Amino acid sequence: MKIQLIAVGTKMPDWVTKGFEEYQRRFPKDMPFELIEIPAGKRGKNADIKRILEQEGKAMLSACQKSRIITLDIPGKPWTTEQLAQQLEAWKHDGRNVALLIGGPEGLSPECKAATEQSWSLSPLTLPHPLVRIVVAESLYRAWSLSTNHPYHRE
């Protein structure tokens, strides 16, 4: 199973790239973790946000064909590390790749929300989207380590 993190936004600060890559490189070969960056639509004072969201959503959905789609969204379901480890095992047994979607400044398009099979809430707080990349990478790595009895996760 391959895990794809599909996120709106490119040219992240160096600390975001380094933080994400620190956890990305730790994933096992049989579970590659890939970042796909979707260019953010141009926002300005008179920007058509609805159109921008629609374009970003189409690009995100085209990047995750035939994958299990999971959105990262505040109204989603919060998972403990143990619950995330169980989800990870269930996803592996499903036989499909997993696409985790992180929206841009205005969130996810209605099309992305409609296509999702699961919605995961990291926190009731609104988190900066660049930071979410690192939190998701670490959380998934921790869940993998728990499910494989790797010493990274300690209770």
Swiss-Prot record:
GO cellular component: cytoplasm
GO function term, MF aspect, one: rRNA (pseudouridine-N3-)-methyltransferase activity
Binding site for S-adenosyl-L-methionine: L72, G103, L122, S123, P124, L125, T126, L127
Main subcellular location: cytoplasm
EC number: 2.1.1.177
Keyword entries, A-Z: Cytoplasm, Methyltransferase, rRNA processing, S-adenosyl-L-methionine, Transferase
Signal peptide start and end residues: none
Subcellular location: Cytoplasm
InterPro entries: Alpha/beta_knot_MTases, RlmH-like, tRNA_m1G_MTases_N
Domain of life of the organism encoding this protein: Bacteria
Reaction it catalyzes: pseudouridine(1915) in 23S rRNA + S-adenosyl-L-methionine = N(3)-methylpseudouridine(1915) in 23S rRNA + S-adenosyl-L-homocysteine + H(+)
Sequence similarity: Belongs to the RNA methyltransferase RlmH family.
Reported function: Specifically methylates the pseudouridine at position 1915 (m3Psi1915) in 23S rRNA.
Subunit annotation: Homodimer.
NCBIfam families given in the database record: PRK00103.1-1 (NF000984), PRK00103.1-4 (NF000986), tRNA_RlmH_YbeA (TIGR00246)
Protein's UniProt name: Ribosomal RNA large subunit methyltransferase H
Species of provenance: Histophilus somni (strain 2336) (Haemophilus somnus)
Taxonomic lineage from the root: Bacteria, Pseudomonadati, Pseudomonadota, Gammaproteobacteria, Pasteurellales
